[in-house]
Amino acid sequence: MNSIKVKIAYVRKDKAPKLPQYATPGAAGVDLQASLDQELTIEPGQIVKIPTGLAIELPHAGVGAFVFARSGLASKYGLALANGVGVIDSDYRGEILVAVINQGSEPFVVKDGDRIAQMVFLPVFIGEFYLADQLDETGRGCGGFGSTGVS
């Protein structure tokens, strides 16, 4: 497994810092925990930004951090990321906030230290754009949504 050095700053000066941890040796995502002063109740349909208390510095622009929902929270309670996937750019230095939506039918309570999302580090390619008169032909062409599943 490849690794990178990620510098972390703990933005909560009133609490002891907690470094993110991988749940298992083969885990791709590191768990992010809620950093709360009190319990937070998320009502059905409500979107909230949950603080983690962490800010990171990625080693270079060729790496991005991506925040994903935790599968258990999504499948058991309907707790999903409000923006689908969170993207943390290499030049962002603010606190990592996790925007979640309760898509379930019951209120969901988040406590300090609860694992609320997972963060994965991935290579990032910067596009160099240029204008073309036309694009190369392919077998798929302009077929969009569901076009490859139709016979």
Swiss-Prot record:
Annotated protein name in UniProt: Deoxyuridine 5'-triphosphate nucleotidohydrolase
Function: This enzyme is involved in nucleotide metabolism: it produces dUMP, the immediate precursor of thymidine nucleotides and it decreases the intracellular concentration of dUTP so that uracil cannot be incorporated into DNA.
Pathway recorded for this protein: Pyrimidine metabolism; dUMP biosynthesis; dUMP from dCTP (dUTP route): step 2/2
EC assignment: 3.6.1.23
Keyword Metal-binding: yes
Sequence similarity: Belongs to the dUTPase family.
CDD domains: trimeric_dUTPase
Residues annotated as binding substrate: R70, S71, G72, N83, V87, I88, D89
Cofactor needs: Mg(2+)
Origin: domain of life: Bacteria
Pfam families with a match to the protein in the record: dUTPase
